[in-house]
């Protein structure tokens, strides 16, 4: 599409998003926003697509932009709250994964250190082989 009409790009973004074609929807919303950076619904809908892709931080930025343009735009406030909740949960999940993996990594580090120490004592610093 070579349209210079922001509403055409916005409509295309909506159609692509409805069809589940998130990447093309993002491209269309970006084109709409290039042509009209104050298109509140385009910012909001771009945020929705990013949310679906679990790109919560980017979605929050889009909702913030929509709210900056129109502080009374309730959809953006609602969507931002959901994105922030899910972003927070993803951080909690990552922290739990890190906490689970930390002891494994510490044990591996200790084992590698012990091996390195034994090789050093035998004088085989580079290859780790017995001399």
PLM region spans:
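Alpha-helical segment of the N-proximal tetratricopeptide repeat
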Residues: 4-35
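Short coil/turn linking the two alpha-helices of tandem helical-hairpin repeats
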Residues: 88-96
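Conserved alpha-helical positions within TPR/SEL1-like repeat arrays
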Residues: 7-18, 41-52, 75-89
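Canonical positions in the second alpha-helix
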Residues: 32, 65-66, 116, 123
């Amino acid at each position: 599409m070579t349209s210079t009409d922001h509403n055409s790009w916005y409509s295309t973004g909506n159609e692509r998003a409805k069809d589940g074609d998130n990447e093309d929807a993002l491209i269309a919303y970006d084109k709409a926003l290039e042509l009209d950076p104050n298109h509140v619904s385009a910012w909001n809908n771009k945020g929705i697509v990013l949310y679906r892709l679990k790109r919560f931080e980017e979605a929050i930025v889009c909702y913030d932009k929509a709210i900056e343009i129109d502080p009374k735009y309730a959809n953006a406030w609602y969507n931002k709250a959901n994105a922030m909740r899910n972003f927070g949960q993803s951080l909690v999940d990552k922290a739990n994964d890190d906490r689970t993996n930390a002891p494994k990594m510490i044990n591996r580090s200790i084992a590698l250190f012990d091996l390195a120490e034994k090789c050093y004592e035998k004088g085989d610093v580079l290859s780790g082989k017995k001399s």
